[in-house]
């Protein structure tokens, strides 16, 4: 499969207009700081799990959790390193390490990483029973694509039905594959497209979701994909990516 050329990650998306370096830098800082919340939430969730008597008795599970904590710390470190690359950050760019990856492994890693985050938010995470074939390959940066999915799962956990279920599914669409996250909450509302604008929030304003969705949109478009969503009953948010079924 062909790789893609380097693309801009932080750029003018959903009305985010940055005219000068001075204007751009605070917005980049807010975007990156927002992304640091997910790994820290994961670590908090794992810490609670480690404190349980059941995990204390299960050596194998305890080692697995410690491994996930290390992975979350590595993700935090990568974000910090990229933030330190001042010249790239000031230009609104971040490096992407592209390569082919199996869709099944991307989904599996995402579910494993997001499980403690959902437990922390009292939500149930599962692979959709109506999911299409989770086969084939996409080309991209594994770290950033997983970050996109975890962002969508985190938003579903925040704004979905309390104690509800979050379902991750896929659907093949010709030479593209759609990856989507559904919940059983109240839907996205009539102005769903506006949620991809910076600093937008859902009806529940306890935590902002606009920064996360803005970054998800930018990353997806850098992979030559597009955002997808459905509001109302059975609502979901997802994205498509170029896909090879082989």
Residue ranges and their predicted role:
Residues 91-96, 137-140:
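Conserved micro-motifs of the catalytic ATP-binding
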